[in-house]
């Protein structure tokens, strides 16, 4: 949907809310993470189906983020906790989808919510998370429209906000260099967080299952997995800080 040149009062209010949420997003994200473990009625008793389905959703989000970062990393992390962008990025995965990093974040959290088998999280928390990103995106669109003008308005006319355009995706990957090192040093924290969440949610689900014999006999494997993920995280972080690996 194209962004209107003159914003309505509702759009202006949403953009203002988006700017507020953007400034405080680093405080809000841990809250959403903790809410995964709040006691709630279950979605289903079929634990295996819910775990596999949720993991696939989160993994899809990770793939979207990897594609966005590996092909073209966008510097849009904010300046002085305000929405900011150095340049308008329209190539790479951004030629097919305007907000791949945000879509990836949403899929990752929604997938974790499904894995948590939590009715409360899926009915309340996930929609709130999506709304939060919708407001942040509206604030970014307002900023980018003012900064880049007609170029940006043409871009949003051609490229969807949420749904990726699949046509030409193969040609995009073939025409651009994919930088795995950049993915590694930019994405290791996000990957560590959601994979650790997956392990914790799995352990909680197994412990609460009617037949928790598998958890009682193999609970230590969850600890091994968390320890392994933390080790990998610290190794990559150390290599990044010492500039052994650079983008």
Range-by-range predicted roles:
Residues 1-94, 106-247:
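Membrane-anchoring alpha-helices and their flanking helix-loop junctions
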Residues 99:
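Short, conserved phosphate/pyrophosphate- and ester-handling motifs at nucleotide-, phospho-/glycolipid
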């Amino acid at each position: 949907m194209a962004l209107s040149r003159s914003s309505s009062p509702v759009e202006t209010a949403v953009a203002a809310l988006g700017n507020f949420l953007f400034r405080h997003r680093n405080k809000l994200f841990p809250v959403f993470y903790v809410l995964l473990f709040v006691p709630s009625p279950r979605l289903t008793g079929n634990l295996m189906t819910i775990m596999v389905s949720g993991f696939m959703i989160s993994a899809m989000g990770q793939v979207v983020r990897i594609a966005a970062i590996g092909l073209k990393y966008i510097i849009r992390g904010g300046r002085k906790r305000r929405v900011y962008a150095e340049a308008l990025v329209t190539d790479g995965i951004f030629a097919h989808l305007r907000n791949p990093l945000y879509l990836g974040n949403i899929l990752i959290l929604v997938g974790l919510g499904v894995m948590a088998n939590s009715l409360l999280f899926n009915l309340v928390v996930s929609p709130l998370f999506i709304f939060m990103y919708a407001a942040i995106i509206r604030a970014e669109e307002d900023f980018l429209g003012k900064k880049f003008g007609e170029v940006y308005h043409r871009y949003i006319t051609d490229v969807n906000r949420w749904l990726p355009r699949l046509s030409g995706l193969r040609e995009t990957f073939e025409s651009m260099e994919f930088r795995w090192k950049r993915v590694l040093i930019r994405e290791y924290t996000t990957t560590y967080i959601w994979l650790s969440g997956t392990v914790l949610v799995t352990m909680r689900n197994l412990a609460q299952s009617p037949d928790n014999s598998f958890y009682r006999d193999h609970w230590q494997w969850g600890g091994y997995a968390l320890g392994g993920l933390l080790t990998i995280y610290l190794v990559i972080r150390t290599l990044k800080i010492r500039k052994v690996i650079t983008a």
